[in-house]
């Protein structure tokens, strides 16, 4: 199993073109960097060989403050209501996104903060008010990531799963949801009437101090169409191991969808960074993590990915369950020396429509420090950053 995975990765690397390019000055400003904070236990490695830890406010505070020190542009937390089980109890232990990010907003000063709303669990008027509150805490640095919900057991356990027809109507639901949000954030009042929501002189005040950013992570046609109409930017998965531009067709689809609406909606790409002094040392880490893959948890993920038969084949959850690199849910993975990772991230920045990356790390605290000290200074697309001047714990 391990050998075949390695062979598949080598094939992908050999097939991927190596790009030689020079970034224009204006392009350098495009490449935003974010951290996908570990709100669930063990981060994004489903392996008995990976660091094992519980999510805590103190851990995430240290991560986001360190990210802010190194000029990361934003921090995002997901929402997960039920995990995958297995030996590692993967994602069986999770904090809640809005309350975590409210706390992090209070202990940071510059970095943009995003929480995720599981829209089946929270009425839009409540999310509008919570977001306005965190806007006040953060001084206008807050935004909302909207998710429709794909993991049926998360909602069945609470008795709120609306039935499997929801898979084909979830973006209709989300469209009404965001229209209510926009009403309440814009004017403080909504009388919206739809199939899913009925507002009757609904009020929210105070309103946010700045326009509230809304983000989404749609890769299906319906998801991209939603993002093209309503999102400020759209997350997508990177693909493969050391194939930094393999996501380019997805970014092109998003760009085309946005052109149909006359809006500018860029792609922010999810990657895991596994870096070390040399390529071989980083590769050894990656192989070690794969050798400890929690097969029981991975089997549960595969089973769940097959439940949605109505959204098409190009969805986030289908990619997550692909066996090629399931140990880190098949997000794009950059494995190499600090210089190699910097070069690959510059290649990401060269893809039309790619405006930023959302990073995870095998070890978040040391990973962010190594990124800030050893990787970012080598990146052309981050050359505009000021020099570091303050100490970080």
From Swiss-Prot:
Residues bound to FMN: 79-80, 145, 154, 170-171, 220
Name of the top EC class for this enzyme: oxidoreductase
GO aspect biological process, one term: uracil catabolic process
Keyword Oxidoreductase: yes
Keywords: Flavoprotein, FMN, Monooxygenase, NADP, Oxidoreductase
EC number(s) per entry: 1.14.99.46
GO terms for MF: alkanesulfonate monooxygenase activity; uracil oxygenase activity
Matching InterPro entries: Luciferase-like_dom, Luciferase-like_sf, Pyrimidine_monooxygenase_RutA, SsuD_RutA_monooxygenase
Reported induction: Up-regulated by the nitrogen regulatory protein C (NtrC also called GlnG) and repressed by RutR.
Reaction catalyzed: uracil + FMNH2 + NADH + O2 = (Z)-3-ureidoacrylate + FMN + NAD(+) + H2O + H(+); thymine + FMNH2 + NADH + O2 = (Z)-2-methylureidoacrylate + FMN + NAD(+) + H2O + H(+)
UniProt record similarity statement: Belongs to the NtaA/SnaA/DszA monooxygenase family. RutA subfamily.
Task performed by this protein: The FMN-N(5)-oxide reacts spontaneously with NADH to produce FMN. Requires the flavin reductase RutF to regenerate FMN in vivo.
Protein's recorded name: Pyrimidine monooxygenase RutA
């Amino acid at each position: 199993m391990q050998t075949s995975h390695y062979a598949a990765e080598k094939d992908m690397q050999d097939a991927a073109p190596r790009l030689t390019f020079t970034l224009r000055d204006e392009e350098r400003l495009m490449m935003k960097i974010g951290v996908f904070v570990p709100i669930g236990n063990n981060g994004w490695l489903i392996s008995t060989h990976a660091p094992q830890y519980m999510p805590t406010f103190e851990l995430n505070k240290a991560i986001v403050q360190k990210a802010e020190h190194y000029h990361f542009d934003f921090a995002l937390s997901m929402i997960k209501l039920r995990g995958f089980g297995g030996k590692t109890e993967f994602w069986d232990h999770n904090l809640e996104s809005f309350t975590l990010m409210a706390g992090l907003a209070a202990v940071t000063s510059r970095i943009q903060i995003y929480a995720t709303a599981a829209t089946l669990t929270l009425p839009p008027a409540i999310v509008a008010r919570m977001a306005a509150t965190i806007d006040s805490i953060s001084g206008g640095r807050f935004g909302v990531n909207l998710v429709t919900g794909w993991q049926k057991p998360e909602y069945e356990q609470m008795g709120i799963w609306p039935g499997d027809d929801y898979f084909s109507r979830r973006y209709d639901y989300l469209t009404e949801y965001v229209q209510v949000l926009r009403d309440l954030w814009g004017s403080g009042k909504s009388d919206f009437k739809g199939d899913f929501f009925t507002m009757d002189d609904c009020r929210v005040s105070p309103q946010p101090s700045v326009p509230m950013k809304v983000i989404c992570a749609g890769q299906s046609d319906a998801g991209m169409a939603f993002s093209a109409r309503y999102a400020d930017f759209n997350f997508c998965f990177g693909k493969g191991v050391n194939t930094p531009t393999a996501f380019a067709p997805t970014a092109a689809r998003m760009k085309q969808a946005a052109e149909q609406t006359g809006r500018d909606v860029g792609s922010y790409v999810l990657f895991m960074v596994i870096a070390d002094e040399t390529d071989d040392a980083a590769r050894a880490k990656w192989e070690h993590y794969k050798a400890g893959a929690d097969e029981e948890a991975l089997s549960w993920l595969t089973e769940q990915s097959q439940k949605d038969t109505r959204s098409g084949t190009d969805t986030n959850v289908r990619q997550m369950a692909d066996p090629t690199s399931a140990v880190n849910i098949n997000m794009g993975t950059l494995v190499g020396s600090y210089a190699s990772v910097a070069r690959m991230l510059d290649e990401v920045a060269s893809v039309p429509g790619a405006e930023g990356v959302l990073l995870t790390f095998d070890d978040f605290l040391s990973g962010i420090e190594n990124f800030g000290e050893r990787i970012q200074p080598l990146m052309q697309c981050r050359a505009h950053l000021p020099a570091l001047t303050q100490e970080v714990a």
